[in-house]
Amino acid sequence: MKCQSIITTACLVGTAFAQAKLKIMPLGDSITEITCWRAKLWDLLKANGVTDNIEFVGSQTNNPQNCQASDANWDKHHEGHSGFLAINIANTLLEGWLASAQPDVVMFMLGTNDVAQGRSLTDIMAAYTRMVDLMRASNPNMKIIVDSVIPLPMNNAPIEALNAAIPPWAAEQNTTESPVYFNDVYPYPSTALRDGVHPNDAGDVIIAGALDPLLTWVIRSSTAAGNSTSS
């Protein structure tokens, strides 16, 4: 009986390991929460044959735009929160979200609300750095994808300054153990906005299409290295 118990336990452990998936957190504000690029991205990832190896994670599963993917079972988990600032996420919220979801990969677009509320570029970049520190404290091997921020026609100069600052910042933050990747969603015309802030369908296509090659590569390289990297 003891032998049978040991064999059963070993089988259960082996099955759990085999089924482990790379955990990817889509992090952001309303541009992550109430738009459809995540559904479109999932379809692109499925076409690339990698969705069996991943799961999106986060405390949210809402779908206010009733976004539809070709895959009816697309993973709706995310950490997008309308109206939230990068500064507030970094200072008070992200640590708990990371502890709950335990992602291996975080991809984020943040800063629109900070700019809209007059926060300085220095403060926004400090929040970015704080977020990276928290991600690495959660998982020393965290893979981090930072998007450029889509246009804000009502006040675009600070967005342009933020987008110019992200690539050199990402290069400074990058490490072998925990790489930081800059993902440029431009060219992104203002006609790809539905209300001057959020992407319309064309904008969702742009964001998903920009993320797809990089995220697919991250997924394949991470799973080839031994499946998920979280403890």
Per-region residue spans from a language model:
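Fungal secretory targeting signals
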Residues: 1-19
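Fungal extracellular Ser/Thr-rich, low-complexity intrinsically disordered regions
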Residues: 13-20, 225-231
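Conserved SGNH/GDSL esterase-like catalytic core that processes O-acyl groups on lipids
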Residues: 23-26, 31-126, 155-160, 164
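Histidine-centered active-site loop/cap adjacent to the catalytic His
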Residues: 26-27, 194-231
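Sec-exported extracytoplasmic/periplasmic mature domains
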Residues: 32, 36, 42, 46-50, ...
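Surface-exposed patches in mature extracellular/periplasmic domains of secreted proteins
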Residues: 49-60, 142, 146-148, 182-183, ...
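Proline-centered flexible-loop/turn and helix-kink motifs
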Residues: 103, 140-141
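Substrate-gating cap/lid alpha-helix
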Residues: 132, 142, 149-184, 201-205
